[in-house]
Design a protein with these regions (language model features):
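The feature marks short-to-medium sequence segments in extracytoplasmic or secretory-pathway proteins
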Residues: 46, 55-80
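Residue-level recognition of well-ordered beta-strand positions that form the cores
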Residues: 43-47, 61, 90, 104-106
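Short, solvent-exposed, Trp/other aromatic-anchored flexible loops in extracytoplasmic proteins
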Residues: 71-100, 106-111
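Short, surface-exposed binding/anchoring microloops in extracellular/periplasmic proteins
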Residues: 23-58
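Bacterial N-terminal signal peptides that target proteins for export
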Residues: 1-9
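Edge beta-strands of extracellular beta-sandwich domains
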Residues: 112-121
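A short, structured loop/turn motif at beta-sheet edges
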Residues: 34-38, 62-69, 93-99
């Protein structure tokens, strides 16, 4: 019986840890196509262990290096079977003095905290 209890403990620990480390949404790729009027279109690839409506990547955001939000792309449903996935957001106005932006992703359980990307803009 002790062996069964140990196996149960190991199995439940593994399940708990795997759910805990499903963790934050990561930005794995970003392309930015900017026009001369400081307006950019972004294609962002996000990876997250989506697990239905209770835990999924629900948005990504373009920010200045100082942390000011410039644009948010809401993700309206889980992508359980499509990982990583790419979504676009166009016509993002970039301040004239901004030459780099940070893109970060969020998930519905852990909020922000995963891998983010810094992107140099050619305007």
């Amino acid at each position: 019986m002790a062996v069964v209890n140990r196996l149960f403990l190991i199995a439940t620990s593994f399940v708990f840890l795997s759910q805990a480390f499903a963790g934050e949404a990561d930005v794995v790729d970003v392309t930015a196509n900017c026009r001369s009027n400081s307006v950019c279109d972004f294609n962002v690839t996000v990876r997250h262990a989506d697990d239905g409506w209770d835990h999924y990547a629900d948005r990504w955001e373009v920010m200045t290096l100082a942390g000011k939000s410039l644009a948010v792309r809401e993700l309206l449903h889980p992508h359980d079977d499509e990982q990583p996935f790419t979504r676009s957001l166009g016509d993002v106005k970039i301040p004239d003095d901004v030459t780099e932006v940070v893109v970060r992703a969020r998930d519905s359980r852990h909020q922000y905290g995963g891998i983010l990307k810094t992107v140099k803009l050619s305007k």
